[in-house]
Amino acid sequence: MSARLRVEELRAELQRRGLDASGNKPVLVRRLDAAIRKEEEEEAAVSAAAKEEADAGGVVDGEGNGEDKRKRKRRGDGEDVDNSESDAAKLEGMSYRELQALAKSRGLAANGSKKEVIERLLCAPSDTDGGVQDKKKIAKGFADGDDRVEECRKEKIVTATRKGAAVLDQHIPDHIKMTYHVLQVWFLLKGDEIYDATMNQTNVGDNNNKFYIIQALESDAGGSFMVYNRWGRVGARGQDKLHGPFSSREQAIYEFEGKFHGKTNNHWSDRKSFECYARKYTWLEMDYGEADRETNKKVSPSTDQIKETKLETRIASFISLICNISMMKQQMVEIGYNSDKLPLGKLSKSTIFKGYDVLKRISNVISRADRRQLEQLTGEFYTVIPHDFGFKKMREFIIDTPQKLKAKLEMVEALGEIEIATKLLEDDSTDQDDPLYARYKQLSCDFTPLEVGSEEYSMIKTYLANTHGKTHTSYTVDVVQIFKVSRHGEMERFQKFATAGNRMLLWHGSRLTNWAGILSQGLRIAPPEAPVTGYMFGKGVYFADMFSKSANYCYASEACRSGVLLLCEVALGEMNELLNADYDANNLPKGKLSTKGVGQTEPNTAESKITDDGVVVPLGKPKAEPSKRGSLLYNEFIVYNVDQIRMRYVLHVSFNFKKR
């Protein structure tokens, strides 16, 4: 598609789409071709959705719940749906450049795919008549030198404003942001009440995936109150409404609590024992810390801070990598999580446990293929853990296979690690003069970089190279740095297993988002709320003797090629060897300390190395085991007591993905 373009033209096209424009011509061509194919697929999806919506005569989402727009009248509180049924169809008929011009004329960002620009236009406030302007007026209405053209070229920047415990919604008008804050009242029996509510509702059958925000506002000078509402499709701006001003706090609270009850069928005062109702919104519990983790600069140490820190340069670089909230947000967005509706810094443990609980119930019915119940439970999961699916049909995202269940389970696990990380990174008691060093101290680990020529470094490099499985051919790996690591208190807990037989040095990989939590808290076993069917050999901590098996769990990509893995000394003792899945494997037979999921290929045991302190390093080249014909290609080792684990090394690696 793009091979005929010159390099500068390729770069321009990629930059116009907000994509990475680095690399040589073949890389640029592949990247642009992939973007164009994606745009074409998205355009087809938008076109189909617009046709379906026009045929049905109803809204895709929002306050209408699918009602015919022609029959709907303006609500008393101003919460009406879009006025024109044909907006989506009109926008779909416009060219990409015309859509960009229209977006700029409304002060909106004009980058991204055609579908993204259309969604932005559909969800942003349009002209006073609610319709789409004539495309010719947009494309040709301004002369080249017109000041309005320059104004249109300025992309509108939306900022978050925080006063007190809660952040003002980003779409509240600027003049209100400057003079109001979220109402916070202290009561003798209840303590602080923060009048800020974010709610979600996903109904797969009705193609609903929508949010509702309510904030009671108090003027900074006191004496004036308002209530702000915003609602719409998850991932879109939606519509909003300001109620007031009210002269008394009680009026604003009455309006806020009335709206909350109307949307959820729950009383605000009883929200801690919230009950979910069909076709009603579910309240998303927020954790109001003392600092805003999304905007506080200290959570993402910069390059300048690395230069100023007392940390050794290699350690500083690694800590900066794993303690980066922006990275965490980006990685979660890539797997579908919507951090705008439930910011990572506001995650509460109860939300994580609710996510696990719904997945557990899905696991109980997934084998029965009960489509109706799976739709209902999937909607419940996406309500608790918000996802941005754009305007795609929700039926495409039903959690109806063990693979999909496993993917969502891994997402909730990552959110659990991020919940720990954000609490860690928000701590105000740390050294503000050297925040990177403060982050390091909070991990409660001692890191020592290994030198390239050292014996330990060479051993680990050999272990890595030899145990890259022949089925894992889509990437190679470069070692960026290897650290010797000691977690505070871990050796003492491990001591009772230090002389146990069969101690091995094994791999453990995980998402980049998870490492601040893992290093500070140690490797942990899934909570009771998690479904056992998500774990092949029961709930435990899983390890591998093949590097690439663990490396796959880093979920690196072209966009983020960094990965982190652990090498742990694991006291396996006598193992319970299994060829196939057993979700109750954690109930070990008497005398067994661990489970081994037996693979068809494993490192040649004759080539293993034994360290001076008696730890087996299975660094031999892979060898097929014809007699072992279970369901696994490679071995897995599982322990059900975290005291059997001692972290020994941390590896920072870079993935090189092969051309397809």
Swiss-Prot record:
Alphabetized GO MF terms: DNA binding; NAD+ poly-ADP-ribosyltransferase activity; NAD+-protein-aspartate ADP-ribosyltransferase activity; NAD+-protein-glutamate ADP-ribosyltransferase activity; nucleotidyltransferase activity
Location in or out of the cell: Nucleus
EC number: 2.4.2.30, 2.4.2.-
Residue positions of motif Nuclear localization signal: 69-75
Record InterPro entries: ARTD/PARP, Poly(ADP-ribose)pol_cat_dom, Poly(ADP-ribose)pol_reg_dom, Poly(ADP-ribose)pol_reg_dom_sf, SAP_dom, SAP_dom_sf, WGR_dom_sf, WGR_domain
Domain SAP positions: 2-36, 91-125
SMART domains cross-referenced by the UniProt entry: SAP (SM00513), WGR (SM00773)
GO CC terms, sorted: nucleolus
Catalyzed reaction equations: NAD(+) + (ADP-D-ribosyl)n-acceptor = nicotinamide + (ADP-D-ribosyl)n+1-acceptor + H(+); L-aspartyl-[protein] + NAD(+) = 4-O-(ADP-D-ribosyl)-L-aspartyl-[protein] + nicotinamide; L-glutamyl-[protein] + NAD(+) = 5-O-(ADP-D-ribosyl)-L-glutamyl-[protein] + nicotinamide
BP GO terms, sorted: double-strand break repair
Protein name per the record: Poly [ADP-ribose] polymerase 2-A
Domain WGR: 179-281
PANTHER family recorded: DNA LIGASE, POLY [ADP-RIBOSE] POLYMERASE 2
Keywords associated with the record: ADP-ribosylation, DNA-binding, Glycosyltransferase, NAD, Nucleotidyltransferase, Nucleus, Repeat, Transferase
Organism classification: Eukaryota, Viridiplantae, Streptophyta, Embryophyta, Tracheophyta
UniProt-annotated stretches for the region Disordered: 40-92
Family membership: Belongs to the ARTD/PARP family.
